[in-house]
Amino acid sequence: MGPGGRQSAEPASTEVFGDSDFVVVANRLPVDQERLPDGTIAWKRSPGGLVTALEPLLRRRRGAWVGWAGVVENDVDVQDEPIVQDELQLQPVRLSADDVAQYYEGFSNATLWPLYHDVIVRPIYHREWWDRYVDVNRRFAEATARAAARGGTVWVQDYQLQLVPKMLRAMRPDLTIGFFLHIPFPPVELFMQLPWRTEIIQGLLGADLVGFHLPGGAQNFLILSRRLVGADTSRGTVGVRSRFGEVILGSRTIRVGAFPISIDSGALDQTARDRNIRRRSREIRAELGNPRKILLGVDRLDYTKGIDVRLKAFSELLAEGRVKRDDTVLVQLATPSRERVESYQTLRNDIERQVGHINGEYAEVGHPVVHYLHRPVPRNELIAFFVASDVMLVTPLRDGMNLVAKEYVACRSDLGGALVLSEFTGAAAELRHAYLVNPHDLEGVKDGIEEALNQTEEAGRRRMRSMRRQVLAHDVDRWARSFLDALADSRPNDSADAAD
């Protein structure tokens, strides 16, 4: 029984089996639906490291991907037939306008997202949002149960679908189920604020393996499993891709581990070496007036990313004369995000006001000191910006990993550039030769930026070489293999016979 006397309905077990031995479950399909001028529907592949890493396995193991196609539907009870796109089987889950408003924009991104990111913005708790979250998670679980072959493996992705493992286990006890959280898992005292805290932990414990970016998230989950569910758990520290924690729940043992996600670093390294990318990077510098130094920020426009922190630090460095306005520029690329959520609308207004103030104070006519783009940037153009810039600014207040930091490093085969990186990113645990800063300490951020701008060539090359060694050795393929190997080892001996 949940808060307020509510009960989470248990899905009924199903005897229906699909034909996919491996199923990925995520909020979005790796394709976007497009309606052509003649009214027909086409599917456009959306880029992403996850599908790149999992595609070979999906092909090899008769895989399927369950997710939302990004289009609002009126009748969510219709079960769409699987889509075959580039030989991948995709199983759409329909969402209505109310689903998007309450499950996605509401509970996922106005309740869970701020709660899991250290309550930078106050989470909103609405019973209606929770009820919709339960309902949509059930639909994802049902679609997965229909797609998965007998004794198959299912990998559920991220915070939008934390109830799916338990629901799916009730429907299909024969399956081996893994779950990975792509955002930070909060400290115990913050998670305890959630009215539906027990239901979330119970939902995750439906998996055989629960994965986080960092050991700290795994440790928090073990504590909450003891406190909220009364489970027995291991007490030792959790390692990275090793020394897994365990939760004992009745006859089941759930493994808990840390698996830092990464990027397709080899492919990115090769693309950044392309002569056209190199030429474009030189053009970018020329278009910016050939400044001595270019600072770069690349983020979704999100309040967790610390865009305001780097802008304020840059403004004060200009005011103090520690950075010269006639030879240094800051480029901020901000991808639009969750534009219907009020806190994101407020953030955009604040950032644009900040940019205007800095340029009004320090720019010359036709020569802004901050170049701000609020729109998506094509992939190759983004890579050219990485190659062109001298200092990459990654200053989130909280971030599960931050792949932009790793992408920048992967693009710098010339060993040029410098990375200023927030201590509160998962990437900071791996990229120890970045200029690590506390985004809550403005003076420290300013010092980090100044050090990066003024580093010697030898010191910069030494730092970048070390970071590249880490990023190229630990790519997204290694991340996926390490998780799936651990999941295979977590498979109960009797799982294949559990449905008999």
Swiss-Prot record:
Cross-referenced SUPFAM superfamilies: UDP-Glycosyltransferase/glycogen phosphorylase (SSF53756)
EC numbers: 2.4.1.15, 2.4.1.347
Family: Belongs to the glycosyltransferase 20 family.
The protein, known as: Trehalose-6-phosphate synthase
Residues annotated for UDP-alpha-D-glucose binding in this entry: G48, G49, R300, K305, L403, V404, A405, K406, E407
Function text: Probably involved in the osmoprotection via the biosynthesis of trehalose and in the production of glycogen and alpha-glucan via the TreS-Pep2 branch involved in the biosynthesis of maltose-1-phosphate (M1P). Catalyzes the transfer of glucose from UDP-glucose (UDP-Glc) to D-glucose 6-phosphate (Glc-6-P) to form trehalose-6-phosphate. Probably also able to use ADP-Glc, CDP-Glc, GDP-Glc and TDP-Glc as glucosyl donors.
A GO cellular-component term linked to this record: cytosol
GO biological process: trehalose biosynthetic process
Subunit-structure text: Homotetramer.
Annotated residues for binding of D-glucose 6-phosphate: R28, Y104, D158, R338
Highest taxon, organism lineage: Bacteria
Disulfide bonds: none
Matches recorded under Pfam families: Glyco_transf_20
Record CDD domains: GT20_TPS
Biological pathway: Glycan biosynthesis; trehalose biosynthesis
Record organism: Mycobacterium marinum (strain ATCC BAA-535 / M)
Top-level EC class as recorded in UniProt: transferase
Feature type site, description Involved in alpha anomer selectivity: W113, I183
UniProt keyword terms in alphabetical order: Glycosyltransferase, Transferase
